Amino acid sequence: MFARRVCGSAAASAACLARHESQKVQGDVIGVDLGTTYSCVATMDGDKARVLENSEGFRTTPSVVAFKGSEKLVGLAAKRQAITNPQSTFYAVKRLIGRRFEDEHIQKDIKNVPYKIVRAGNGDAWVQDGNGKQYSPSQIGAFVLEKMKETAENFLGHKVSNAVVTCPAYFNDAQRQATKDAGTIAGLNVIRVVNEPTAAALAYGMDKTKDSLIAVYDLGGGTFDISVLEIAGGVFEVKATNGDTHLGGEDFDLALSDYILEEFRKTSGIDLSKERMALQRVREAAEKAKCELSSAMETEVNLPFITANADGAQHIQMRISRSKFEGITQRLIERSIAPCKQCMKDAGVELKEINDVVLVGGMTRIRSGGGGEEVLPEGPVRGVNPDEAVALGAATLGGVLRGKASDLILVDVTPLSLGTSVVGDVFVPIIPKNTTIPCMRSHIFTTVDDGQTAIKFKVFQGEREIASENQIRGEFDLSGIPPAPRGVPQVEVTFDIDANGICHVTAKDKATGKTQNITITANGGLSKEQIEQMIRDSEQHAEADRVKRELVEVRNNAETQLTTAERQLGEWKYVSDAEKENVKTLVAELRKAMENPNVAKDDLAAATDKLQKAVMECGRTEYQQAAAANSGQC
């Protein structure tokens, strides 16, 4: 076999991307940071990106989804009821997206979350609520994206369909495709999936006139990324990226939770590890303590009535110092050092060449998780809001794609090598890691047996020399090869990575011209039919939410009318007893309707309207009679 390079230089990729971006997108484009713990949405407001506030008035939204009966809760409402509904409240689901159930990280997560993680029919990791209904991680992500979409639509005053959605730089192909699927389920046209550190670099560098070499240290709720970028003349070129897709704030929370549970076990002899509600309370307390220790030297964890035994109610009360927290989480910080060093090596730069380190992600607020020191000894700069930079950068890119922002060229890279296997389970990288994208490369393969008429191709992603030690992303067969002696047929295999980092593979028999094409979605992933069904489910949820919201509005109006009528009954002096009795009857009827949980919205609205009209008529009588009485006195 031999290889032939088709494309791959930064200049070629930039040219490809520039041509692609010359086709401007129609309509507003929102930028969404779909985070592990919090999500954020931004859009272009004039020539600047702007973060949008959600319906609760906050600029970030918890990436939490809960199901309570027939009700779906998203964001803050879902997070607030997590303690009382742990089995049906899903958080940090981004850590599951695009992963197989057998993944070692998934097996660890199963032990650490109060909800169930189950094996789907396709082998992926899904979640299951307390009623036994299963959801894919993409579906849960879609519910959060719907909230982001709604937030943008409330600000813009019209429907939104286009989005740039971010993902960790070290996400593999399956995770990127699953992220894009989440957008599709949410009713969004995801025009670009962009790496989070790259988006943050856009937010940081758009107004910079000086050429610079920067490192973006992104430690978020569930993932860690480190990227080195060169910014020069409107070109943002990623030199290298590295990271850990299972390292983030959730791991710090878990480490502190484990410490609290162990200390409680030592003093009380009680193991809380099997009590879901208690675990959720401890987890929330650990998260709160972690945040407080970013500015305080010490904090207190106080959880009264955490459980009970023969001696009565038991409480957790302990003080935790910042130094103790740093000791508990030191091993997690150390896990970020190796990716930083490898990224610098892959980029071919030395520490002294880095001009700035940009800190991104909420965890960079924590002193022990501030990061950057291993990349830039002089210390990092805090030039952007770590919670908002990624969404702002995504919105900026959306503005460029729409033609509403300054032109720029973004040259990103693929984080992991993509290739196939040959005889002996040897991995042949066709597109090496940190290759600039979009990119297309080809290799020529041949048969190993005389008369062989078909070749099975397995696509792997990773850095191990043994193919089976890497992650398999998909497989396909090319059949119909004319029989010939081994080594004679020539099959050209082409790997094409688009601007979203998603790979498409084509195998072509050069003798017959026969081809086989696939888009890599791993062995699992969502089928087109599953995505369409999830879109229908989402639309049904949206309809149910609309009906419920309208019923709540009608109930609120009914309650207001009841309060008004009951107050007026005690104040009327000139209204006849018969009219008062009529109002009392209508009040009783409306109150009875309010007590019926199955009352139809229209019936409740009609009863409310009837009472309102009667009260208004009595009010008119009261006013006229009072005016006449006052006139007679004059």
Swiss-Prot record:
Primary location group: mitochondrion
Xref: PROSITE patterns: HSP70_1 (PS00297), HSP70_2 (PS00329)
Domain of life: Eukaryota
Keywords: ATP-binding, Coiled coil, Mitochondrion, Nucleotide-binding, Stress response, Transit peptide
GO molecular function, one term: ATP binding
Transit peptide start-stop: 1-20
Cellular location(s): Mitochondrion
GO cellular component: mitochondrion
Coiled coil: 538-614
Pfam families listed in its UniProt record: HSP70
NCBIfam families reported in the protein's UniProt record: PRK00290.1, prok_dnaK
Family to which the UniProt record says this protein belongs: Belongs to the heat shock protein 70 family.
Name under which the protein is recorded: Heat shock 70-related protein 1, mitochondrial
Organism whose genome encodes this protein: Leishmania major
Gene it is expressed from: HSP70.1
